[in-house]
Amino acid sequence: IIYKSQKGFNLYTNFSEKVILTKKNIVNFLNKRNLKKKKLKKTDLYIGFFGYEILNNLIGVKVPKQKSNNFPKGIFYKPDTLIKLSENLKYRSEYQLKKNKKFDININKATYTKIFNNFKKKIKKGETYQIKICTKYKNQSKIDPLDYFCRLSKTNLAPEAFMIKDKNFSVISCSPENLIIKKGSSISTKPIAGTLRKKKNIDKSKALKFFRKNVKETKEHNMIVDMERSDLSK
């Protein structure tokens, strides 16, 4: 597992425990505490991810049954070794990579438009005030996950990113926002909302000016901040 932060890259390896989350064990996993050790090491932690389905089950939210793809609903690893890596991560792949530029999407434009218009009516009726329509893209290519992660880290300037390389799958993610940060008794969040296409003639000051004057972008950002504030209060 490689984790990228503003301070560089952390490589976690030699895992003593691997927990595949299910409906039956997630509560016990979240309540697990190490009360014996007074001084915790930097490897006294779990690294992994939660799937939306398993979190929805945890809080009693019902969602339509999803197609099974045999991918874990959530998985966490406990490392025994931490290696600090250089900020300029370099890697040369030994594999012959085969890239396919064609992507398949699970819904077409007509179906997406129908879903969008339906949700638009629900928002106008006051049933909800935010809906995120998700689509799934598939691509059949032969890539090296670490090589892909290194390339992504150079082109995407997100402050945080990570890569999990397991035996049968790899997960790569990067995000400009941090949902939950907990340090001691302090909990904070760093939400981001708004979209502006990158152009050579747009610098940071011009981008800020655009977001401050744009009504749609300002309202979207305020809505996200309000939602995060509500979540933290719970």
Locations of regions flagged by a protein language model:
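Extended alpha-helical targeting/anchoring segments
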Residues: 1-234
